[in-house]
A protein has these predicted regions:
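Left-handed beta-helix
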Residues: 153-163
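Short cytosolic juxtamembrane segments of multi-pass membrane proteins
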Residues: 252-262
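Short hydrophobic, aromatic-rich alpha-helical segments embedded in or entering the lipid bilayer
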Residues: 35-48, 210-222
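Glycine/proline-centered hinge or cleavage motifs at structural transition points of membrane proteins
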Residues: 169-170, 183
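The alpha-helix within a helix-turn-helix
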Residues: 166
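Membrane-water interface segments at the C-terminal ends of transmembrane alpha-helices
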Residues: 3-35, 48-155, 180, 184-204, ...
Length: 262
């Protein structure tokens, strides 16, 4: 028994070292911009850079729009499949998995061919149109995470009973979804939203090919032209991502644990 515990701790130490040592090395390097000693100058340079503020703010705005549009699509669809058409669930799950199967570069080239200046809907002709195209591309990219989060939330409540009770009280379908179903799955919705937001903020391929100056593109440009600031940006991105994961874990503590009644 003691030998098993010893080996377990050895494996844990090796695994932890595999992840922690590169992170610690990156942190150390980001603090060595001055040879005289450790300093936060690299982080100060990043936060003071107007391009950081612009690209991060733009990525955050696009991310929030992505979450809103994604919820407007996913929540009603998942609710309908759960309540009225459970036979469609395998098809919906397959469709939502396609963004994980199809490479992002293939996806964005398809968008460019469909919505270029010679198409019926030339979104790439204007900044607003390209930003809209980027948002919908991110909605597709976030579908696997958003749909599964919402579907998991719907599994924890009795959708049939709640819908029947709300209908008896005179609620229409929009009121049922917005005032009854949505508040009961808010924790799952927020989990999917934080995960989608974390993915969108760091995305590079789609935004780069659409010529959008987002945070991921800014990180690549800084990495190509500076030494210590890229390390600082990596740590900032790491903190943002794990902050989102921490929020998901925290919100998960408040999720309902009871299974729906049959």
């Amino acid at each position: 028994m003691k030998r098993n515990k010893t080996w377990a701790w050895i494996v844990f130490a090796i695994g932890a070292s595999y992840f922690l040592l590169p992170l610690l090395a990156t942190i150390k390097f980001s603090l060595e911009i001055r040879k005289a000693g450790w300093t936060l100058d690299a982080y100060a340079n990043v936060f003071a850079d107007p391009r950081f503020q612009q690209t991060f703010g733009y990525s955050l705005l696009v991310g929030l729009c992505t979450v809103v549009v994604g919820l407007l699509i996913v929540v009603p669809a998942a609710y309908y499949v759960r309540l009225r058409a459970p036979q469609l669930r395998p098809i919906i799950e397959f469709v939502t998995l396609l963004p994980l199967i199809v490479p992002a570069i293939v996806l964005v080239f398809g968008y460019i061919r469909l919505y270029n200046s010679s198409s019926l809907l030339p979104l790439t002709n204007s900044n607003l149109g390209t930003a809209t195209l980027l948002t919908f591309a991110y909605v597709a990219l976030g579908l696997p995470y958003m749909y599964r989060a919402v579907d998991t939330g719907l599994r924890t409540i009795d959708v049939q009973t709640l819908t029947e009770a709300a209908t008896i009280m005179g609620a229409n379908q929009v009121q049922v979804i917005t005032q009854v179903i949505f508040p009961n799955i808010i924790v799952a919705v927020l989990s999917g939203a934080f995960l989608t937001l974390a993915i969108v903020i760091g995305e590079f391929t789609i935004a780069s090919l659409l010529n959008q100056q987002v945070f991921g593109v800014y990180m690549q440009n800084v990495g190509a032209n500076r030494a210590y600031e890229p390390a600082a940006l990596s740590i900032i991105s790491f903190i943002l991502t794990w902050g989102a994961m921490g929020m998901i874990a925290f919100l998960g503590r408040f999720a309902p644990k009871t299974a729906p009644r049959t």
